Design a protein with these regions (language model features):
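Nucleotide-activated sugar donor-binding and catalytic core shared by glycosyltransferases
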Residues: 1-232
């Protein structure tokens, strides 16, 4: 038996299982084909001319405000932008209304045929397109982690070569976040100042998280296949 994590290993051991092997968590392995959906040429041109200093991924209410607070403190140049990808995209108009008092120019993705060049925030309001935008950011905040929600899966962000920033509430993906933290791919903050300090320090750092995860996942897949071959 090959439990996916230490917690499952412990439960199975208590139940009397003896032949247990920790081969690694298969959730870390991405066996899906890359999406063939790409940005339109005008959108590609826009993002190449900008620098995404932060992406808020799978955000929940109040977390967009947090991302904007961070963005306004770290932004140095006009071509630096914030990307927001809410967990529930139907909240897009509510988010725009919520941020009105900030006097920032927000562009919705569904209006992206003609992107305003002077925008501050690019807001994704469609499902199934997040991965296309994650690749443009080196630092990604994963939502559901400031509020008591339990966090969101950070692996898509890591696979797009980003460092993950998150709050303390990640119990739904506890082992994955612990693993990423150990590998220095993710960072947990307790308050706004901690998050701000970390981003300022990491803003110009180039860490190949994609390669790190690929190496680890390849090892897990190899060990799992070797173990399965014993029973074929």
């Amino acid at each position: 038996c090959a439990p996916q994590n230490k917690e499952t290993h412990s439960y199975l051991k208590k139940l009397g299982s003896k032949k247990l092997k920790n081969l690694g968590n298969l959730k870390l392995c991405d066996t899906k084909q890359k999406s063939l959906i790409k940005l339109k040429s005008s959108q590609k041109k826009f993002f190449k001319s900008k620098k995404v200093v932060l992406t808020g991924y799978s955000t929940h209410p109040t977390e967009e405000e947090f991302c904007v607070d961070i963005f306004e403190r770290i932004r140095k140049k006009k071509n630096e932008i914030l990307v927001l990808i809410p967990r529930h995209v139907e909240r897009a108009n509510a988010i725009i209304n919520q941020l009105k008092h900030r006097n920032l120019i927000i562009q919705k993705h569904t209006l992206g045929n003609k992107i305003q060049n002077n925008i501050d925030i690019y807001l994704i309001d469609t499902y199934g397109e997040a991965k296309k935008f994650l690749r443009y950011s080196k630092i990604i905040f994963t939502g559901g982690s400031i509020i008591p929600h339990g966090g969101q899966n950070p692996l898509d962000a890591v696979r797009e070569n980003a460092i993950v920033l998150h709050g303390p509430n990640v119990q739904n993906f506890k082992e994955i976040y612990a693993f990423l933290s150990k590998e220095k791919i993710s960072y947990q903050f307790r308050n706004f100042n901690q998050a701000l300090k970390y981003i300022k320090n990491k803003k110009s750092v180039n860490i190949n998280t994609k390669l790190k995860l690929k190496t680890i996942s390849s090892k897990i897949l190899k060990n799992t296949k070797l173990e399965l071959m014993k029973y074929v």
